[in-house]
Amino acid sequence: MQKKVTIYTDGACSGNPGKGGWGALLMFGSVKRELSGYSPATTNNRMELMAAIQALEALKEPCEVALYSDSSYLVNAINKGWLKRWTSNNWKTAAKKPVENIDLWKMILELIRLHSVTFHKVKGHSDNEFNNRCDYLATQAIKNNR
């Protein structure tokens, strides 16, 4: 039986593009682990994806994951089938344009094959303490350049 892990993620960017940070909170039972990182030149969407990637990569074995994000870009790509269509269309959007952030989407595809992941949308900058913590981690990563 797989471990059940809850993950919250967030990305932030100072300017878009600009300096970016991401934060993640992993919870298994009473154990909590915080992760964060920084990029000197990026976009908000890349940081949202990177938060999910780094959180899923931190898992040491296949897990059942509930991943919560305030990123419509991330959650809708999975839940509305955009990612499947992009891969079927040779990484082209419905408008026949190249999909942005292909490198990161390919990493997410690999990770969701390893784990059983459900993606959930949460409202950003509201009263969700876990999402707010991830936002804090992401903005601190930008502030501290790490």
Swiss-Prot record:
Report the CDD domains cross-referenced here: RNase_HI_prokaryote_like
Question: Which GO annotations describe the biological process of this protein?
Answer: DNA replication, removal of RNA primer
Q: Where does Mg(2+) 1 bind?
A: 10, 48, 70
Q: Which Gene3D superfamilies match?
A: Ribonuclease H-like superfamily/Ribonuclease H
Where in this chain does the record put each RNase H type-1 domain?
1-143
- List the Pfam families: RNase_H
Needed cofactors:
Mg(2+)
Q: What is its main location?
A: cytoplasm
The protein in question is named Ribonuclease H
Question: Upper taxonomic classification of the species?
Answer: Bacteria, Pseudomonadati, Chlorobiota, Chlorobiia, Chlorobiales
Q: Which gene encodes it?
A: rnhA
